[in-house]
A protein has these predicted regions:
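Bacterial N-terminal signal peptides
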Residues: 15-23
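Short intrinsically disordered, low-complexity coil segments enriched in acidic
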Residues: 1-2, 18
Length: 256
């Protein structure tokens, strides 16, 4: 028997892992309510995948310190079909190489550049480029699974507890609908004008962001916009679980 090199063995293991992930994502047509679980890695972070039935919809929880968003998504994916991504973290930033990064600031090379230098301004010659190249490679594999097809929705769930509110998004927004009875810290960002028209009639604050900014901060929303994906960010105050569950349900029931 010819011995298998270490490089070849790692290659085969990676191919097997990718095949397992793809089978989970696309191979659940037998039972609509079958729950499948696996994981994928991106930039040193582990994302647990939970799939319920067969749907193009994708959901993601990105910040480990936003636990209300996690609970809302766990509840939702048990009731509705789709594939949910849960980051395995308890903090906002995740460790990567010799620094930490915000996982919602590395969905473009420019964003990753600023994210890597935020907590570590000085890098040894050549090492920053190597780190960026590694994130680039992993990003493509991650997004191949995360991004839905043309009929699906991509929904990200976030919480705020530092004064962040809908008014801070006005500069990046093309259209705005603010409800007088709604707290400004509870709102929806969407990237599709037709979806915005429907959400205007909802009880929730909503902004439309369908033009790329001058400076790309690496957030998932801009990558979704570049790919013409129907993206939603459901943002609520930390601890307002019922609110976030209701907002998620509204999108599911009215925009599918």
């Amino acid at each position: 028997m010819v011995p298998i090199s270490r490089h070849r063995r790692l290659y085969l293991l990676n191919r097997l892992f990718l095949y397992t992930i793809i089978s989970i994502v696309y191979g659940s047509e037998i039972h609509d309510k079958q729950i499948n679980k696996s994981f994928i890695m991106f930039a040193g972070a582990k994302f647990n995948l939970v799939q319920n039935g067969d749907s193009p919809n994708r959901y993601i929880w990105l910040h480990g310190d936003e636990q209300t968003a996690r609970m809302a998504l766990e509840y939702h994916i048990g009731l509705y079909n789709g594939l949910a991504f849960f980051i395995e973290s308890e903090t906002r930033e995740i460790p990567f190489k010799s620094t930490i990064v915000d996982p919602n600031r590395i969905f473009s090379r420019d964003g990753a550049y600023y994210a890597l230098r935020k907590f570590k301004p000085g890098w040894q010659p050549g090492t920053l480029k190597m780190a960026l190249d590694e994130i680039d490679r992993e990003r493509e594999s991650f997004l191949d699974i995360l991004m839905p097809n043309k009929n699906g929705l991509l929904i990200s769930l976030h919480n705020n507890f530092r004064g962040y509110n809908v008014h801070k998004e006005k500069g990046n927004s093309q259209r705005i609908s603010i409800k007088k009875n709604e707290n400004p810290r509870d709102f929806i960002i969407c990237t599709n004008s037709s979806d915005f028209e429907i959400l205007v009639s909802s009880p929730y604050n909503v902004v439309l962001q369908n033009e790329l900014p001058e400076r790309d901060d690496g957030s998932l929303s801009w990558e979704a916009l570049r790919r013409n994906v129907r993206y939603f960010n459901i943002e609520t105050r930390l601890g307002y679980l019922s609110k976030q569950k209701a907002m998620l349900k509204y999108i599911e029931d009215n925009l599918n």
